[in-house]
Amino acid sequence: MNEVLAKGKKAKEIARELVLKSTEQKNEALSAIADQLILETAYILEENKKDIEEGKAKGFSDSLLDRLMLNEQRIVDMTEGIKQLIELRDPVGECVSAWERPNGLSIQEMRVPLGVVGMIYEARPNVTVDAATICLKTGNAVILRGSSSAIHSNKAIVAVIHRALKQTSLPQESVQLIEDTTRDSAKQLFTMNDYLDVLIPRGGKQLIDTVVREASVPVLETGAGNCHVFIDETADKQMAFDIINAKTQRPSVCNAIETIVLHEKWAEQYGSELFSSLKKRGVELRGDQKALAMDSTIVLASEEDWGTEFLSLTPAVKLVSSIEEAIHHINTYGSMHSEAIISENEEKVSKFFVSVDAAALYHNASTRFTDGSEFGSGAEIGISTQKLHVRGPMGLPALTSTKYVIRGNGQIRK
């Protein structure tokens, strides 16, 4: 039996144990993981350094290296996230609804774990911690399959998690890592319907599209973040300038702006100043012919650029003559993640909210807030851009299903 199949079978067995664990037992395990991460920070960073060095040798971009890199503060941030997760209400066992039928049957809809969650993701070692702890909190066994670029970091983190779980009532195999990073292991994970209840891809568009296209296992799609901001002709200048920091504050994340859509009338007044401000921050602009006419240093955008999640300081710029044109462009090229409008015209804002198809829509605010903690709902395992079974930041309830519990006293159907 190969690694993937063996770990799938083990995860199915473990899932039946985890459903019996209390909230207190799960929280004790999370606390142990947080403590062990701090205790073994030096070991994790030593292994992460190997990934960074290999990445540099392979010519990884700065944005990819940033996603791959761990440091003491990022590990502290991970542990703080775990502590916040401990404080969140456990959804498992929650009664979603209850009613009584005329025949005396009492019916309850109860939250239960999904069972076995598969996570396939790219060069983000922090996802290893996020996925493991969120799954444990919700009583799910998890099989992790990261990328080859982060294999040293992922192996180290999972080893630390195992050492932590050994001190608790939760089985070490509640969290398992597929160490084979070849395409064959990924393809096998795609079709493990007998063992996986759901597969969650987290990464770039190519990875997500591949999983959605090839997996027979149910998929919770965490879409790429080709996010837009539309600056309407009525937009406040300073507000617009401030909100554009959604691109420059941390460009390598999925909720950063990738395309700036400018109303022509606003651009006539403030466009050149905006472009100059962005270039001072090291931004390389790619725009349409109208943008080029305003600033000759802008690179002409290709058709491919409009649909690209750059994950770097390279936004595209599109000039439009109406909100209808802006909405059409966003719905054509957007990834249904997060979209924003900056406007003082409430009628246009309402039209934007009704017409744009995305998980999160913003008025006069940055798209960078599409995040479980920023929404106030706590930890999330990704941002879903699909419409079933959940949309937007996927918090703890997203990793549960429901079942019906019916109590009677001898009723039969006649």
Swiss-Prot record:
InterPro entries on file: Ald_DH/histidinol_DH, Ald_DH_C, Ald_DH_N, Aldehyde_DH_dom, G-glutamylP_reductase_CS, Glu-5-SA_DH, GPR_dom
Source species, domain of life: Bacteria
Keywords per UniProt: Amino-acid biosynthesis, Cytoplasm, NADP, Oxidoreductase, Proline biosynthesis
Gene3D superfamilies with a match to the protein in the record: Aldehyde Dehydrogenase, Chain A, domain 1 (3.40.605.10), Aldehyde Dehydrogenase, Chain A, domain 2 (3.40.309.10)
Disulfide bridges in this chain: none
GO biological process terms held by the UniProt record: L-proline biosynthetic process
UniProt xrefs under CDD domains: ALDH_F18-19_ProA-GPR
Reactions listed under catalytic activity: L-glutamate 5-semialdehyde + phosphate + NADP(+) = L-glutamyl 5-phosphate + NADPH + H(+)
Gene Ontology CC, one term: cytoplasm
GO MF assignments: glutamate-5-semialdehyde dehydrogenase activity; NADP binding
Localization (cell): Cytoplasm
Membrane is among the record's keywords: no
Protein's pathway: Amino-acid biosynthesis; L-proline biosynthesis; L-glutamate 5-semialdehyde from L-glutamate: step 2/2
EC numbers for this chain: 1.2.1.41
Job of this protein: Catalyzes the NADPH-dependent reduction of L-glutamate 5-phosphate into L-glutamate 5-semialdehyde and phosphate. The product spontaneously undergoes cyclization to form 1-pyrroline-5-carboxylate.
Stated family: Belongs to the gamma-glutamyl phosphate reductase family.
Protein name: Gamma-glutamyl phosphate reductase
